[in-house]
Amino acid sequence: MLTNVEIQNIIPHKYPFLLIDKILEVEPGKRAVGIKNVTINEPFFQGHFPGNPIMPGVLIVEALAQTACVAGLMLEENKGKLGVFTGIESMKFRRQVVPGDTLRLEAEFLAFKLGMGKAKVVATVDGEVAAEGQIKFAMIDTNKKA
């Protein structure tokens, strides 16, 4: 298990854009399972939507991507790199996520070679699928000159 502080030592995201509270399971370069406790204090609920707060789907996808990044960046060859989206495939949203929900975030790598990868991702609340699909990503070295 990884705490929020440990996660911040692996991926560069910080509040308010760090969307993982803890990692329950991780196999570097293979898979990760994370948790996001959704509270009414999230900044995005101020405008999405007043009186009917719903977590934006794109932020659920971002939370899934951050979970995948933890697994990818824990590999020795990727330490210090930046995980970035290169594509989103077949993403489906099946349930609204609201304040009080605990979002379980699962990412399983389908392919990962030479810093490029594809992962199957699923977000659930109480065992019910909120979002599922596939994402593509790359691990880039921000210190290299173009």
UniProtKB/Swiss-Prot annotation:
Subcellular location: Cytoplasm
GO biological process per UniProt: fatty acid biosynthetic process; lipid A biosynthetic process
Broad enzyme group: lyase
Pfam family, one: FabA
EC number: 4.2.1.59
Chief location: cytoplasm
Family annotation (SUPFAM superfamilies): Thioesterase/thiol ester dehydrase-isomerase
Reaction it catalyzes: a (3R)-hydroxyacyl-[ACP] = a (2E)-enoyl-[ACP] + H2O
Residues the record marks as active site: 48
Disulphide bridges, residue numbers: none
Transmembrane intervals: none
InterPro entries: FabA_FabZ, FabZ, HotDog_dom_sf
Record keywords, A-Z: Cytoplasm, Lipid A biosynthesis, Lipid biosynthesis, Lipid metabolism, Lyase
Gene Ontology cellular component list: cytoplasm; membrane
Molecular-function GO term, any one: (3R)-hydroxyacyl-[acyl-carrier-protein] dehydratase activity
NCBIfam families, A to Z: fabZ, PRK00006.1
General function of this protein: Involved in unsaturated fatty acids biosynthesis. Catalyzes the dehydration of short chain beta-hydroxyacyl-ACPs and long chain saturated and unsaturated beta-hydroxyacyl-ACPs.
UniProt record similarity statement: Belongs to the thioester dehydratase family. FabZ subfamily.
Name used for this protein in its record: 3-hydroxyacyl-[acyl-carrier-protein] dehydratase FabZ
Species of provenance: Acetivibrio thermocellus (strain ATCC 27405 / DSM 1237 / JCM 9322 / NBRC 103400 / NCIMB 10682 / NRRL B-4536 / VPI 7372) (Clostridium thermocellum)
Gene behind this protein: fabZ
